[in-house]
Regions:
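Short Gly/Pro-enriched turn/cap motifs at secondary-structure boundaries
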Residues: 16-17, 127, 148-151
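Residues that act as N-cap/strand-start positions at coil-to-secondary-structure junctions
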Residues: 20-22, 130-132, 154
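Residues at alpha-helix caps and immediate loop-helix transition turns in enzyme cores, especially N-
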Residues: 24, 47-48, 95, 215-219
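C-terminal regulatory/interaction regions
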Residues: 238-239
């Protein structure tokens, strides 16, 4: 049975499950919102997301209240729930589709998706959907960034940065061959390595891996070892 793992005071995740295949679901608590990375495909993932508390954060109503805290009347502001979908494969986003179809009720406010995942999800009622084609950042008590990432595995993939952690989903994995060898695209892999090197976080988090978290250097070293096997006039590298 999947279990909930705490990475820091602000970050926890529900581990991957296999029947059905359901990716790790990450929850990052900002000062004003939960930032949820992927939604999985199983009922336990729905329960995990729905159980994230919207406990109000107290803020002072005015600058005058800031200067006189004893007389300040706090304003209760419930936490928002923002979902970031890494890519369009069903083990990462099925529960959003199930929500849209009325099969389950998923508690969230805004959905951030890449172009391909946006097409899979389709139109949404009573929820905001934002299609991400360029990096967007938020100061939410911690640094939050949602950014497209070049990869061989799935078009339109997104990563989520939360301070010193970057959640990559399946972006470092090859394109699945479905009966033929899995492969990396040479040009895209080169772009990905360059981008990953430019990122500040030192903790790289890969879906479906035991323990989830890897050192930045080890992930880049592995990808560079794959890239080193490229052959002249060949567009792909067998994984």
């Amino acid at each position: 049975m999947p279990r909930i793992v705490k990475l820091s005071d602000r970050i926890q995740y529900l581990q991957v499950s296999y029947e059905p295949l359901s990716a790790d679901v990450v929850a990052v608590r900002g000062d004003s919102a939960w930032w949820i990375f992927d939604v999985g495909a199983c009922d336990m993932a729905v329960d995990f997301i729905n159980a994230l508390p919207r406990n109000p954060v107290s803020e002072n109503a005015s600058q005058g209240a800031l200067e006189n805290r004893e007389s300040a009347a706090p304003v209760s502001i419930p936490l928002q729930k923002n979902i970031v979908i890494s890519h369009f494969h069903r083990d990462h986003l099925l529960n959003v589709v199930r929500h849209c179809d009325g099969e389950v009720s998923l508690d969230f406010d805004t959905l951030y998706v890449g172009l391909h995942a946006s097409k899979v999800v389709g139109e949404m009622n009573c929820r905001e959907k934002r299609t991400v084609t360029a990096p967007i950042s938020f100061d939410d008590g911690i640094h939050i960034e949602v950014l497209p990432i070049p990869n061989s595995h799935a078009k339109g993939s997104l990563a989520l940065i939360a301070d010193d952690y970057v959640f990559l989903g399946d972006a470092t994995y090859p394109m699945v061959g479905h009966g033929t060898p899995d492969v990396y695209n040479v040009q895209i892999l080169e772009q990905q390595i360059k981008m990953l090197k430019s990122l500040s976080p030192t903790h790289f988090c890969l879906s479906h891996k035991r323990g989830l978290v890897r050192d930045k250097s080890s992930v880049i070293q592995f990808l560079e070892s794959v890239y080193a096997r490229r052959q002249k006039n060949e567009n792909y590298i067998v994984a």
